[in-house]
Curated annotation (Swiss-Prot):
This is Arginine biosynthesis bifunctional protein ArgJ, mitochondrial. It comes from Aspergillus clavatus (strain ATCC 1007 / CBS 513.65 / DSM 816 / NCTC 3887 / NRRL 1 / QM 1276 / 107). HAMAP family: ArgJ. Heterodimer of an alpha and a beta chain. Belongs to the ArgJ family. Substrate binds at residues 184, 213, 224, 311, 449, 454. The lineage of its organism: Eukaryota, Fungi, Dikarya, Ascomycota, Pezizomycotina. The alpha and beta chains are autoproteolytically processed from a single precursor protein within the mitochondrion. CDD domains: OAT. This protein may be expected to contain an N-terminal transit peptide but none has been predicted.
Length: 454
């Protein structure tokens, strides 16, 4: 772990977070020193040099199961879907979510808007991994991230895939290096793992591991954000897809850095059943309910690391919309607040300008009729230290705000904004609630993205 210990000042945004770790001191706490990884999964991170300026850092990730997996994925809604997205979609459809063995990912080039040639490049990446596995049917999902509109140096990648396959390992260091290999403007690799049990198999201990990348162009459905989750629990493909869809809607699709949606987003989950036990195949089972809670909570923790690494970000903000007639309306309001440049810049400037929050609530499109009524809307700042909330607006009436306390709350790295649509503790509309996580906008964000291609 010594390689991950060097501290630097400011927001360092090399194209990929280097292994000799130019990681801000405040971010080092997010790098795990150990992990509990699922049985039967092997991983590797290999240097290819996809981006010409990358002369030594790993930029090719390979995740492989020793046995066939159930697999599911959620993809970007951007109309310009990248070649690897198209290829992975086709593979999952043809295999009906069964028999998937690997995921191969390159960073440094998105392979998006690259025509037929780019599509063939993505196909050939998957084929090369399948050849290494000795498989004749497409069994590999493909992901790419980086600059849009440029072709991959496909010969270099194909030449290095056998090396990546030969270097597959199950150690914590291998998982960490693999998580690092998918980074672009991230300042740290994002990796989590945990163990769990299921009601029907209390004697079996299962593991769940996940890695993700993303720091900018983040406002899913989904954004320039990749993620792979692996578990050794036995889950049928149909159950796995619905579990992932639910988890992603409340995690990776509930975060925002800058409001942009990319061409490449993919979150995939692989389940190989290597830890044994009864398979999860029914949405009505106790195991399914438990797995839904476990996967959603895990995905939320993983996705929040993306927000904490937002380009130029200085704050991690939770917005909680309560007492809505339905979840979708609450989520739309939370999303609108999270992507408001005026809200984000006010938070960066430590300005308790709650009028900007109220404005975002008011112009939210698509909410159910009667959801937003000014006379019963309340807005508060909730400090993370457990102290009393700072009420800004109560039932449509402005409070006398203690500006000194507001400034003190906004100086903290973490902050929660609470929007109550019911106008009281219990509310008049019901108990539906949605949560979104986002970061502020700073001068650094402009600098980072102005220099992106260099």
């Amino acid at each position: 772990m010594a390689a991950f210990a060097r501290m630097v000042k400011g927001q360092v945004r090399n194209y990929s977070a280097p292994l000799d770790m130019a990681i801000p001191a405040s971010k080092q706490k997010y790098i795990p020193s150990s992990g509990s990884y699922p049985k039967g999964f092997l991983v590797s991170g290999t240097h290819v040099g996809v981006k010409a300026s990358n002369t030594r850092f790993p930029d090719l990730a390979l995740i492989s199961s020793e046995t066939p997996c159930s697999a599911a994925a959620v993809f970007t809604t951007n109309k310009f879907q990248a070649a690897p997205v198209q290829v992975s979609k086709k593979t999952l459809q043809e295999r009906q979510g069964q028999g998937i063995r690997s995921v191969v990912i390159n960073s440094g080039c998105a392979n998006a808007v690259t025509g037929k040639g780019g599509y063939e490049d993505a196909v050939n990446m998957g084929k090369k991994v399948d050849e290494c596995e000795g498989l004749s049917k497409p069994s590999t999902l493909v992901m790419s991230t980086g600059v849009i509109g440029q072709r991959l140096p496909i010969s270099k990648i194909l030449d290095k895939i056998p090396t990546a396959y030969a270097n597959l390992a199950s150690t914590h260091e291998a998982w960490l290096t693999t998580a690092r290999a998918i980074c672009t403007t991230d300042t740290f690799p994002k990796l989590l793992s945990r163990t769990f049990t299921l009601p029907s198999s209390p004697g079996h201990t299962y593991s769940l591991a996940g890695m993700t990348k993303g720091a900018g162009m983040i406002h899913p459905n989904m954004a320039t954000l990749l993620g792979v989750l692996c578990t050794d629990a036995p889950i049928a493909p149909s159950a796995l897809q619905s579990l992932l869809k639910y988890a992603v809607s409340r995690s990776f699709n509930s975060i925002s850095v800058d409001g942009d949606t990319s061409t490449n987003d993919t979150i995939a989950v692989l389940a190989n059943g290597a830890a044994g036990g009864a398979p999860i195949n029914s949405a009505s089972s106790d195991d399914y309910a438990a797995m839904q809670e476990i996967l959603t909570s895990f995905a939320q923790s993983l996705s929040q690391l993306v927000v904490r690494d937002g380009e130029g970000a200085t704050k991690f903000v939770t917005v909680r919309v309560q007492n809505s007639p339905d979840y979708d309306s609450a989520r739309l309001i939370a999303s609108t607040i999270a992507r408001s440049p005026l809200v984000k810049t006010a938070l960066y400037g430590r300005d308790a300008n709650w009028g900007r929050i109220l404005c975002a609530i008011g112009y939210t499109q698509g909410v159910a009729p009667g959801t937003v009524v000014p006379e019963r809307t309340s807005v508060s700042f909730k400090p993370v230290d457990g102290s009393a909330v700072l009420k800004l607006l109560v039932n449509g009436e402005p409070e006398q705000v203690d500006e000194e306390r507001a400034s003190a709350i906004l100086q903290e790295e973490d902050l929660e904004i609470v929007v109550d649509l019911g106008g009281g503790e219990k509310g008049e509309l019901g108990g539906e609630e949605a949560v979104y996580w986002f970061c502020d906008f700073s001068h650094e964000y402009v600098t980072i993205n102005g220099d992106y291609r260099t």
